[in-house]
Regions:
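Short, charged helix-capping/linker segments at alpha-helix termini
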Residues: 16-27, 37-56, 70, 164
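Sigma70-family region 2
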Residues: 42-45, 58-73, 93-95
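Structural recognition of an alpha-helix C-terminal capping motif at a helix-to-coil junction
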Residues: 38, 52-59, 73-85
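Short helix-coil-helix linker/hinge
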Residues: 132-140
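N-terminal module of bacterial RNA polymerase sigma factors
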Residues: 1-35, 42, 133, 155, ...
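DNA-recognition helix of helix-turn-helix
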Residues: 84, 88, 139, 145-148, ...
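Arg/Lys-rich amphipathic alpha helix in sigma70-family domain 2
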Residues: 63-67, 81-102, 121
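Internal acidic/polar
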Residues: 2-10, 97-121
Length: 184
């Protein structure tokens, strides 16, 4: 993950102050736009959907920033949580009734990875992405946040509202399943 997790306390104060909120929020968007886009993209796969997730994330964050009570070090986890929930809501709403669970959505998305990557994509990378999308949702979330975003377990716990020990087990199982799928 890009170094965006720690913002200065005075920047958080600027976000909470209605007179300075807009400028501070613009800086926040600049710092988190790219990491949140890639987080969303790994969940929803399609570029346009990821852009929608990020846009909705920042709209919700702007609307609620005045009520945010965490410290400066918790702001990134808060944004990731909003993005994660927004992406999951999008996946649940996609073609209602067609999927019985988010895991069904994951299987459909895995088949779309090859379409998104095109014919020139590295086959190993495509297989890796498809294997990730076939993981159970919780394992996929933990794997993406830990592997791609290099988030410490403590921050992942704040994003997902889970205990660190549970997340470590989920990550371990995800890695084992990926190794198994990729060595076949």
């Amino acid at each position: 993950m890009e170094e965006t997790r720690d913002i200065p306390a005075e920047e958080l104060s600027a976000l909470r102050n209605p007179a300075t909120r807009r400028g501070a929020f613009d800086r926040l968007v600049g710092a988190y736009l790219r990491p949140l886009y890639w987080h969303a993209r790994r969940l929803v796969v399609v570029h346009e959907d990821a852009e929608d997730v990020v846009q909705e994330t920042f709209i919700r964050a702007y609307d609620k920033i005045g009520t945010f009570r965490g410290g400066a070090g918790e702001l990134g986890a808060w944004l990731y949580r909003i993005a994660t929930n927004t992406a999951l809501t999008m996946l649940r709403r996609r073609r209602p009734g067609l999927f019985s669970s988010l895991d069904d959505v994951s299987r459909i998305l895995a088949s779309r990875v090859a379409e998104e990557c095109g014919e020139d994509a590295d086959r190993t990378l495509v297989r890796f992405q498809q294997a990730i999308l076939e993981l159970p949702l919780k394992q996929r979330l933990v794997f993406n946040l830990r592997y791609y975003d290099r988030m410490p377990y403590g921050e992942i716990a704040r994003v997902l509202g889970q205990r660190e020990e549970t997340l470590k087990v989920n990550y371990h199982h995800a890695v084992q399943k990926l190794k198994e799928k990729l060595t076949r």
